[in-house]
């Protein structure tokens, strides 16, 4: 009887380990060249027309695709996306288009990784690409909805015009990169 319990316990442990290992396995094979091109085209379309409802199905595909593929991993750093001022603004009345811009920043980072596979480890360059992509989308939103202004996003556009956006991103991302290194 005792031997049966020990064997049962061991088998239970193995089954738990196999479930845990299965969760670490990729959901699918690496991305294909065709999928990457589709994703890049969508990212550029969304920079120009982030509110285009005809792109919503493609956007849903892109979100799921990024979750599933094992070969493109995007790092998210909330302070970098739009800055701590933007995050503070969100505590009051949230900016209407935050979800669109957040996804655009993520898509912009992934697009950078696809276009620059040799820079997969350069998180600052990835963050910068994401912010630049989101700022393009923000500018496009303002063309269709002039009331959709955000002081912090306007400040980022100004930093971009002055050539100071890269410094801002580098400084803002230090906390995120420090946390990654400490893991």
Predicted regions and their residues:
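Non-catalytic accessory regions used for complex assembly or targeting
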Residues: 20-34, 162, 170-183
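Residues at structural and domain junctions
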Residues: 8, 25-28, 48, 92, ...
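Positively charged n-region of N-terminal signal peptides that target proteins for export
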Residues: 1-5
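Bacterial N-terminal signal peptides
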Residues: 8-18
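Mature extracellular/secreted ectodomains of secretory-pathway proteins
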Residues: 54-175
């Amino acid at each position: 009887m005792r031997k049966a319990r020990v064997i049962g316990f061991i088998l239970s442990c193995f089954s738990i380990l196999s479930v845990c290992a299965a969760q670490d396995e990729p959901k699918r094979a690496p991305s294909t060249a065709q999928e990457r091109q589709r994703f890049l085209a969508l990212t550029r379309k969304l920079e120009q027309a982030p509110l285009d409802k005809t792109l919503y199905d493609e956007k849903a595909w892109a979100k799921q695709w990024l979750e599933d593929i094992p070969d493109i991993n995007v790092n998210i750093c909330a302070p970098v996306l739009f800055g701590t001022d933007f995050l503070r603004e969100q505590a009051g009345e949230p900016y209407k288009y935050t979800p669109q811009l957040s996804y655009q920043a993520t898509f912009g980072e992934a697009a950078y990784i696809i276009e620059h596979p040799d820079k997969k480890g350069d998180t600052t360059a990835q963050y910068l690409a994401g912010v630049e992509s989101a700022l393009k989308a923000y500018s496009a939103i303002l063309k269709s909805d002039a009331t959709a202004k955000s002081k912090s996003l306007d400040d980022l556009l100004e930093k971009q015009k002055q050539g100071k956006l890269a410094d801002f991103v580098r400084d803002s991302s230090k906390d995120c990169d420090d946390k990654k290194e400490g893991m």
